[in-house]
Amino acid sequence: MLLAACTVEPLATSSSDSTLSTGLAGQATSEVLSGISVAPVKTRVAQQVRNRLLFAMNGGELKPGGQYEVVLSVSERSQTLAVEGDSLTATAARVIVLVSYDLVDVNTKKVVAAGRRQSVASFDRTPQSFANQRAEREAQDRAAREVAQQLRLAVAQDIASL
């Protein structure tokens, strides 16, 4: 009997009896997410985050007439984690991708929700510069993929609370 007041629902439900709030009554979260656009970005890592987020929200097919837009601000940096004793050569590093987002109502241009998410991916360094560049780029891509999933969940929670 303690669970009688429980209102937990899956975020990706497509059931027609699922409502998110009075403003979005009758629309499942997945339907609302599929109509959200993501503003263009400028850097390679930001583009990776944007592409992954778009695909996670709508499978790459944006429904026209969406009510919301996600505006991303993406920063990325690398940090050395370990160095070789005598030569002080970096042997391990990590990439940190930090994303701030605003969920904007397209009609009123007002920010209805905002947040920050980050992801970290580690990689090994070698004496070969090309291998280091590839390892860092792959770490950036892994971090971008992870933070995009975090953003999808955050935006879904924001939509559900409207």
Task: Give the ranges of each region predicted by the language model.
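Bacterial signal peptide processing site
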Residues: 7-10
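Post-signal peptide N-terminal segment of mature Sec-exported envelope proteins
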Residues: 15-41
